[in-house]
Amino acid sequence: MKYFSVLVVLTLILAIVDQSDAFINLLDKVEDALHTGAQAGFKLIRPVERGATPKKSEKPEK
């Protein structure tokens, strides 16, 4: 949700300021950084989830 909010705010600023090349380049870099950070976060979360879930132990039948 924060990612979406940041993009909305930056888009509104872009509409107000006018479309200058420098500002568009800055907006692209911020979007890329947020996207890369989100991907890195998901890559870190998955192994933690796997380690946190208990493994099912198979009990031998008697």
Swiss-Prot record:
GO terms for biological process: defense response to Gram-positive bacterium; innate immune response; male-specific antibacterial humoral response. Keywords: Antibiotic, Antimicrobial, Immunity, Innate immunity, Secreted, Signal. Its main location: secreted. Residues 1-22 form the signal peptide. Induction: In response to mating. The keyword Signal applies. Ejaculatory duct of adult males. It is found in: Secreted. One of its GO terms (cellular component) is extracellular region. It comes from the Eukaryota. Male-specific peptide with moderate activity against Gram-positive bacteria. Belongs to the andropin family. This is Andropin. The lineage of its organism: Eukaryota, Metazoa, Ecdysozoa, Arthropoda, Hexapoda. The gene is Anp.
